[in-house]
């Protein structure tokens, strides 16, 4: 198992100095991935339900501060040497598909082949409407098409795609990514996401803290991973070739956080407890663990990074 840091696009990483410091230190400490989230605007009023909080509210919905995901990945590419750059996750319908493919390929070239695309279909209908995305109700089908178009553009000498949401032919798309094709990890925890991961993903990359589809135990994660692999088999694919990551936000190394029943929340507690959680997911099939401990204070974020890399990772 290797490890990554989800930086987000706000807080301590929401400015040049903070993003540079955290990205470079994660690189120096030998972490494998830097993750960046994807929002462009928030509307002042919204009926959409954020899937990763019990009350359905996004933590920044009131003020909406967020840097652009792909711009942050480009910046991080310029100030790091080895760490991979992960869209964690990209809301696939947010941007026009050919432009998105070009931006990701360009970052891959400028980083010498360090891009991994985490891909999701999104949850904030009002944001998609502002951006002119395909209708919210067809975001899954549109995302599937966009992904097929990305791969055509990245790998084919004369790329073409004809579909309900993406149409192009007779185009020259250069440069191609440095990698044969940019790996695409499908995000999401529900049945549709598991099906998408198994059938068209290069990997699966769920979050553990989804109240509707919780993966906050290694056993729950293992059961859902088995479902992803079944979907791969049904699609005629080798299920063991799928890459498997997991995103554990809310990391606390120190006093454990307790849920309403008094049970310790996963990935909180002593270094040994957090490492034990990580080993559980590793044994269940996860190859990559990305943790999140966003802070508004740079010194605090750097301290948390040091503790995780030096006190937890060696125990896994």
Predicted feature residues:
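Active-site-adjacent structural elements that line small-molecule/cofactor binding pockets in enzymes
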Residues: 1-316
